[in-house]
C-alpha cells in the first residue's frame, strides 16, 4: 500500500472514531502514527476536544495533545475511562492484536484495561490472517534485562534489543527496555503471552487479546 493511500485510510478511521466521542468524556489516547492523525483530526472540533479529559498512553502523545490545546490529565484522576482510542500493528480475524511498535505497550495496556469502550484504528495493511509477521514487543525491566532476554529466547525464532539508529538502547516511559521477538510458525500467541508472564523481569508483551 502506498503511504498516501495508507494515510488516507488512517484519516478516514480517525474521523469515524471521533463520532463515538461525546462532550465531557474521559478519553484514553493511544500512541503511534495513526493516533497522530487522530489528534490532528480531533483538533478541528474545539467545542468537543475542549471538554474532554485525556489520559495519554505516552509522553509523546501527551505532548502532541497539549500542543493542540487539549486537556491532558494524570491517570490517577479517574479510576475508569469512558473510551480508549488507539492504533495497532497487526490485527487478526479474532481481533487479537500485536501492539507496541511505538514503544508504549505497557501504558497502552493499562489504559485499555480501564476503559469501558475500546476502539482500535487499523488500516487494511494491519489486518492479517495470523499474527506474527510483525515482531512481538516484549517489555523487560532494565535491571538484568539480558538475563530475562536469555530466558525468553527459546520461545521465539529470534529476539532483538530495540535500539536507535545510533546504537543507543531505547527506553520506554517507564524506563524499561524492549525486545522485538519473531514468533515461531504455528505458535499460539495467547499461550506465548502466558509463558512470558512467568519469566522474572518481563513486564508485559505487545499481545492484546480480549480484556
Regions found by a protein language model. Name each.
Residues 2-86:
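N-terminal active-site beta-alpha-beta segment that forms phosphate/nucleotide-binding
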Residues 2-8, 59-211:
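Conserved phosphate- and dinucleotide-binding cores of soluble alpha/beta proteins
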Amino acid at each position: 500500500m502506498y503511504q498516501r493511500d495508507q494515510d488516507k485510510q488512517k484519516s478516514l478511521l480517525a474521523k469515524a472514531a471521533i463520532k463515538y466521542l461525546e462532550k465531557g468524556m474521559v478519553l484514553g489516547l493511544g500512541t503511534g502514527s495513526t493516533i497522530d492523525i487522530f489528534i490532528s483530526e480531533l483538533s478541528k472540533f474545539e467545542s468537543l476536544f475542549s471538554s474532554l479529559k485525556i489520559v495519554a498512553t505516552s509522553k509523546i502523545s501527551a505532548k502532541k495533545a497539549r500542543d493542540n490545546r487539549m486537556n491532558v490529565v494524570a491517570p490517577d484522576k479517574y479510576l475508569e475511562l469512558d473510551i480508549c482510542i488507539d492504533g495497532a500493528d497487526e490485527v487478526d480475524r479474532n481481533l487479537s492484536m500485536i501492539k507496541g511498535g511505538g514503544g508504549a505497550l505497557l501504558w497502552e495496556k493499562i489504559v485499555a484495561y480501564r476503559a469501558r469502550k475500546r476502539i482500535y484504528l487499523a488500516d487494511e495493511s494491519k489486518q492479517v490472517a495470523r499474527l506474527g509477521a510483525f515482531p512481538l514487543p516484549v517489555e523487560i525491566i532494565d535491571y538484568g534485562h539480558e538475563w530475562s532476554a536469555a530466558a525468553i529466547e527459546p520461545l521465539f525464532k529470534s529476539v532483538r534489543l530495540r535500539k536507535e539508529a545510533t546504537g543507543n538502547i531505547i527506553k520506554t516511559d517507564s524506563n524499561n527496555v524492549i525486545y522485538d521477538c519473531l514468533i515461531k510458525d504455528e505458535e499460539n500467541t495467547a499461550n506465548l503471552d502466558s509463558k512470558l508472564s512467568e519469566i522474572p523481569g518481563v513486564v508485559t508483551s505487545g499481545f492484546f487479546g480480549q480484556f
